[in-house]
């Protein structure tokens, strides 16, 4: 996806991906994470239930949220246990090794017995924002991959905006391999990109 920042009047407006997840090992291998000066968010989410905000968090990673998460009315005790079980089962998830039948994310969550309430208040708004869709119909395997990484990593932002990420990655790429303002119109032989200016 697109990653960048617009700098205007001392404000930073990030475009494309809004946070950096520290668990994505491939991205970490492409840049020096220390160079982009990450600032971290606490694990969890602040959710509005129609009346007021409540916090749902991972007490295993943020002990300060233990009681607020345990006694939150956003989800039943059963849902909380199912989330912890899902986190445990997907802790070392590999999408390449997943031999289970694929289905939509919403079907997967329903098959695991999550209540409609926790799906509507947590899973749908959180993952719809990631998948860019309303009803989380995205592949359950991709959901498991994303859930696993969010369970292990932390959401973070570079101190001077998301633009620091492509800037850092580009330092390790030869200048003649970077094409700016060029539209891709096709892929040839699975490894050659064709641009609209007829260059390959």
Label the predicted regions.
Residues 142-191:
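Helical element adjacent to the flavin cofactor pocket in flavoenzyme catalytic cores
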Residues 196-200:
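Core beta-strand elements of the Rossmann-like FAD/NAD(P) dinucleotide-binding domain
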Residues 27-28, 32, 37-136, 151-152:
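Mobile amphipathic helical/loop "lid" adjacent to a hydrophobic cofactor/ligand pocket
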């Amino acid at each position: 996806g697109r990653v960048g920042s617009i700098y205007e009047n001392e404000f930073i407006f990030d475009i494309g991906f809004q946070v950096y997840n520290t668990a994505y090992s491939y991205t970490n291998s492409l840049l020096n994470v220390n160079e982009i000066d990450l600032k971290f968010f606490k694990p969890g989410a602040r959710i509005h239930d129609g009346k007021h905000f409540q916090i749902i968090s991972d007490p295993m990673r943020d002990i300060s949220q233990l009681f607020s998460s345990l006694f939150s009315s956003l989800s039943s005790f059963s849902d909380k246990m199912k989330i912890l079980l899902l986190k445990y089962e997907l802790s070392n998830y590999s999408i390449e090794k997943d031999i289970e039948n694929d289905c939509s994310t919403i079907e997967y969550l329903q098959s695991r017995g999550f209540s409609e309430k926790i799906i509507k208040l947590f899973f749908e708004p959180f993952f719809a924002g990631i998948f860019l869709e309303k009803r989380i119909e995205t592949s359950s395997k991709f959901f498991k991959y994303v859930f696993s990484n969010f369970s292990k990593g932390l959401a973070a932002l570079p101190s001077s905006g998301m633009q620091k990420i492509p800037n850092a990655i580009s330092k390790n790429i030869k200048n003649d391999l970077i094409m700016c303002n060029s539209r891709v119109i096709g892929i040839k032989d699975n490894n050659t990109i064709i641009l609209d200016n007829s260059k390959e």
